[in-house]
Amino acid sequence: MSYTIAAQIRTEIGKGSSRRLRHANKVPAVIYGPGKEAISIVFDHKDIINIQANEDFYTTDLTISLDGKDVAVRVQDMQRHAFKPLIEHIDFKFA
């Protein structure tokens, strides 16, 4: 199954800005890979919480729609809240 997630590039980096994003029901994330510069992104929590429950979300390539461009990525790491059903941060790797 193919997944497409709409995201925006984030300009504010750091702990404070990430906390503000999480408070606004957004998920900060980063896309990185060898030979390419890392891209900090943000997307809505509701866009990711339901599709991450599927097993193939972690094993197949995903498409992130980023400012009109489609970027193929794969989930590298996901940080979750300790006891709430929230995703706090996701690391993607270029596919």
Curated annotation (Swiss-Prot):
InterPro entries: Rbsml_bL25/Gln-tRNA_synth_N (IPR020056), Ribosomal_bL25/Gln-tRNA_synth (IPR011035), Ribosomal_bL25_short (IPR020055), Ribosomal_L25_dom (IPR029751), Ribosomal_uL5_bac-type (IPR020930). Coiled coil: none annotated. This is one of the proteins that binds to the 5S RNA in the ribosome where it forms part of the central protuberance. One of its GO terms (biological process) is translation. HAMAP family: Ribosomal_bL25. It comes from Shewanella piezotolerans (strain WP3 / JCM 13877). GO terms for molecular function: 5S rRNA binding; structural constituent of ribosome. Keywords: Ribonucleoprotein, Ribosomal protein, RNA-binding, rRNA-binding. Transmembrane segments: none annotated. The keyword Phosphoprotein does not apply. Part of the 50S ribosomal subunit; part of the 5S rRNA/L5/L18/L25 subcomplex. Contacts the 5S rRNA. Binds to the 5S rRNA independently of L5 and L18. One of its GO terms (cellular component) is cytosolic large ribosomal subunit. Belongs to the bacterial ribosomal protein bL25 family. This is Large ribosomal subunit protein bL25. It comes from the Bacteria. NCBIfam families: PRK05943.1.
